[in-house]
C-alpha cells in the first residue's frame, strides 16, 4: 500500500473495536525515556541504594539487572555486599561497591534498545514509583493521545497497551501522565512476558487473550519489525512517525499506513458477544495481563 510522504497529511483508518498501542515513539516521546527517566535514575540510584541496599528486594533486583545485561556476569550482589548492614555501615559498603553499580547502570542505559525482553531499570522500579508518586516525574503523552483515547472509548472500542516495559511501569506512566490518570481508558496491558514484540505468535496470543480475532485489532507502533510481526498474525497495523523516531526508507513507507498523529483513528463498538468471549477466556486462562487492572502487576513496584 502506497503512502503519502506529506508530513501534514492525515491518514484515516477504517474503524476497529480494539486498538493495541506501543508506548515509546507511539504514545510517548522516545526522548522522555532517555532525557527524563534515565537521568532521574542516574541522580537517584545511589541515594536509593544507600537507603535500601541491605534489603533482600533490592539485592534481588540488582541481581536480575546483572543477569539481563550482557557482560555483567552473574555474581550475586550478596557476595559483594556481605552480611546485612544498616545506616552508616550500609552507606560505607555502597561506596565500596559504587564503581560496580555505576558501571552496571551505564551498561543498562547503553543496552536498553538492544535488550527488548529485559526490564532493566524498571526492575529497580522502586525508584520510578517514587519519581511518579512524588510528582517529580510525569509521564509524557503526545497531545493527540488523550482526545483519541476519549473518541475511541466513546465509540465503544477497547484500548490495550503492549510494551517492552513491565506492566507495572506502564501503569505508572499512564497513571501519572502529564494529562492525569489515563488508566480508565485502558482495558488491559501486555509486556514481553506475553512474548517478544517481533514474534507473530505474541500478537496471536494477545488476540486470543482479549477474545477477538486478530483482524479486529489495529496495532500501532513506530517499529516496522513489530508491525510486520503483528501483520503476520493478521492484525491490522499502522506505522507511527513522530519527531525523533527512527527514519523510514522509501520502501518501508509503502508497507503500512503511516500516522503522524492519532486524529485519523476511529473506533467501532466492542460488542457484548466479544466482551463475553473475552471474560470467558480470562476465566479459562487466568490471564494476568488482562487482569492487571484488578490484580497485582507482573512486576510489583
UniProtKB/Swiss-Prot annotation:
Q: Which residues does substrate bind?
A: 163-164, 197
Q: What SUPFAM superfamilies has UniProt attached to this entry? A: HAD-like
One Pfam family name is Hydrolase
Per UniProt, what is one GO molecular function of this protein? magnesium ion binding
Q: What EC number(s) has UniProt assigned to this enzyme?
A: 3.1.3.77
Cofactor annotation comment: Binds 1 Mg(2+) ion per subunit.
Residues annotated for Mg(2+) binding in this entry: 22, 24, 222
Q: Name one GO cellular component term.
A: nucleus
**Highest taxon of the source?**
Eukaryota
Pathway given in the UniProt record: Amino-acid biosynthesis; L-methionine biosynthesis via salvage pathway; L-methionine from S-methyl-5-thio-alpha-D-ribose 1-phosphate: step 3/6; Amino-acid biosynthesis; L-methionine biosynthesis via salvage pathway; L-methionine from S-methyl-5-thio-alpha-D-ribose 1-phosphate: step 4/6
* One GO BP annotation of this record: L-methionine salvage from methylthioadenosine
Reaction catalyzed: 5-methylsulfanyl-2,3-dioxopentyl phosphate + H2O = 1,2-dihydroxy-5-(methylsulfanyl)pent-1-en-3-one + phosphate
Subcellular location field: Cytoplasm; Nucleus
Q: Which InterPro entries match?
A: Enolase-ppase_E1 (IPR023943), ENOPH1_eukaryotes (IPR027511), HAD-like_sf (IPR036412), HAD_sf (IPR023214)
Q: Where is this region: Disordered?
A: 273-301
Q: Does the keyword Cytoplasm apply?
A: yes
Query: Per its Swiss-Prot or TrEMBL entry, what cofactor is needed?
Result: Mg(2+)
* Swiss-Prot/TrEMBL keywords: Amino-acid biosynthesis, Cytoplasm, Hydrolase, Magnesium, Metal-binding, Methionine biosynthesis, Nucleus
Where does this protein chiefly localize? cytoplasm
What does this gene product do? Answer: Bifunctional enzyme that catalyzes the enolization of 2,3-diketo-5-methylthiopentyl-1-phosphate (DK-MTP-1-P) into the intermediate 2-hydroxy-3-keto-5-methylthiopentenyl-1-phosphate (HK-MTPenyl-1-P), which is then dephosphorylated to form the acireductone 1,2-dihydroxy-3-keto-5-methylthiopentene (DHK-MTPene).
**Self-association state and partner proteins as the record states:** Monomer.
Question: Which family is it part of?
Answer: Belongs to the HAD-like hydrolase superfamily. MasA/MtnC family.
- What HAMAP family does its record include? Salvage_MtnC_euk
User: Under what name is this protein listed?
Assistant: Enolase-phosphatase E1
Organism field: Monosiga brevicollis (Choanoflagellate)
